[in-house]
């Protein structure tokens, strides 16, 4: 039997043999997970953690039906898709049945990155064009072609990292974006920016192959595009000879509840040309898929070049995929996402009335974001405060992450078996954390705080030298003048001393 390593030993070996860019959660005190079940994960001491961040274990960690399907098929056969096998075509039929009729051709691959990379190949072959429009703060994968279309990543490389054939459109964020909730038609306004990008590209003798977007931005801060945005963008992109790629890698398979696919939130009159899938598709097993139209698939095949993927669509992966689809239906996980998601959002909105640090609650189903702000008037991101909260929750055995361009958005994307009791537990703990934090940093909690009223923060006069110095009220946005990464600042303001500092290099969760 193999020796069981301590956390310290694991970190020592990781430092020696695992690349330094491969990060872990809670780097100052990482968690060693030894098993998981449903929405819970367990460490080496048997401590149970509520998992609020794992959109990979879609139907629940270690679901017995998924395990049974994998074992049964693995005992019989696992080979590649060049041999005929029932599982491949059965799974293709079942998957296609969840999509609009025109999306009818599958390419099975092994990760979301592979899926998005193949989607770009399909788009470029079909259109004969090269350029791609992507959204600001987008993340689409780790391979070179996808880093190129992921501002979330390439902005870290400097101002010259953006390729000339990549065009970045504003994220359709109606809370802190270019056009906000008070705009009469933010969907049209954001879509007009895409039209302007296309026109500018044409002026520079460039042609658009594709517009790609997550149906709801995850790493970008849990952004829900305004209704009608995708329809208008699709119209402009098609007119320019391009195609629309909907990235469902993080948000597909019923997470929004009402619909199986998040792009369907835009309405029945919107149809992407290519849809990519990953993460939840195999409940932790490495598999993914690209689904497109017959016309695009035929154009790709017309090159005469075979497309073969060694592991894509193998019998074991397809058996697992079938089990996941079956569980989503049998256990009514879409219904659960709607019911529990609505309950979670209601509880969080109650906390918004109580806590000035909460600027916005947004989400659909079990995809929810809590935008933390230093003040509601200027919507100044509460980055250090968000990191403090997720570390304090970790102490309570609750796993939550923060992301977005300022790392100030608490992200809920739990396994789909997440229930009302779990939601109540998490929100109660967030309430306690915010209450203690607001008291420590001098923000006055007020249930009746108006959206246009800044949260006031009491700041001691550090130059007086008097421990009983008179407190003065300042708009909390002034706190930007001090570095939230400074250790003394963090301790003096009640922030968790071990929580990670604000850096442009983020762990994608």
Swiss-Prot record:
Enzyme Commission number(s) of this protein: 4.2.3.2
Location relative to the cell: Mitochondrion
SUPFAM superfamilies cross-referenced by the UniProt entry: PLP-dependent transferases (SSF53383)
Region (Disordered): 451-509
Basic and acidic residues: compositionally biased ranges: 451-474
UniProt superkingdom: Eukaryota
Primary site of residence: mitochondrion
Gene Ontology MF term list: ethanolamine-phosphate phospho-lyase activity; pyridoxal phosphate binding; transaminase activity
Entry coiled-coil feature ranges: none
Quaternary structure, from the entry: Homotetramer.
PANTHER family in the cross-refs: ETHANOLAMINE-PHOSPHATE PHOSPHO-LYASE (PTHR45688:SF1), PTHR45688
Name of protein: Ethanolamine-phosphate phospho-lyase
Biological source species: Xenopus laevis
